[in-house]
């Protein structure tokens, strides 16, 4: 299975990955942060076969096996703590927050902003970074800190909520690596970020 991480972006020793579930209309959570719809039952029926390059699309376990750091926002961190199941050990979690202080559950580190998180990643010799949470993903994309996106589309329209993507200063071209159909009709698709190579 070719699920290796892409090469790091310019000036970085680590590759950045977005891995998330999204509704068909582009939301990662309802307005109040609820994500229960991600596991809601869908009508039974024959699913379409996986598309080209299905073997290149990592599942959650494969992703965790090739990252050593996870950066998420405070709201995402607190939502995971509420669930009561911590799936990230032994990955080092960094929480973006200007309000959290003192030791955090599961040894999570706190960075006040994105630039501080990047400095922390560099100082710790990170090799693979997983970006999670809407605002965090959007900030990482704007800062050119994402090299690959693995997006699982859930066959459900929720009509509004927290969007996966936000404003960008310029278009971000992507290269499709593969797609595969999961249980319940979900489709997981992997893209690599394409960076223009300077001719000069």
Each language-model region and where it sits:
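Enzymes that bind and transform nitrogen-containing heteroaromatic metabolites
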Residues: 1-200
């Amino acid at each position: 299975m070719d699920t290796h991480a892409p090469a790091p972006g310019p000036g970085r020793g680590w590759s950045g990955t977005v891995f998330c579930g999204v509704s068909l209309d582009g939301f990662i959570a309802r307005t109040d942060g609820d994500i229960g719809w991600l596991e809601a039952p869908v009508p039974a029926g024959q699913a379409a076969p996986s598309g080209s390059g299905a073997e290149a699309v990592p599942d959650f376990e494969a992703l965790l096996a090739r990252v050593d750091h996870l950066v998420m926002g405070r709201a995402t961190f607190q939502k995971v703590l509420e669930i009561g199941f911590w799936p990230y050990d032994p990955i080092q979690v960094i929480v973006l927050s200007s309000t959290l202080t003192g030791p955090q559950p599961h040894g999570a580190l706190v960075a006040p902003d994105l630039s501080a998180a990047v400095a922390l990643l560099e100082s710790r010799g990170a090799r693979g970074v997983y970006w999670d949470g809407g605002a965090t993903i959007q900030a990482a994309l704007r800062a050119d800190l994402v090299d690959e996106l693995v997006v699982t589309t859930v066959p459900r329209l929720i009509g509004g909520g927290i969007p996966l993507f936000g404003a960008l200063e310029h278009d971000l071209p992507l290269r499709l690596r593969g797609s595969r159909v999961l249980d319940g009709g979900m489709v997981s698709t992997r893209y690599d970020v394409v960076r223009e190579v300077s001719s000069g």
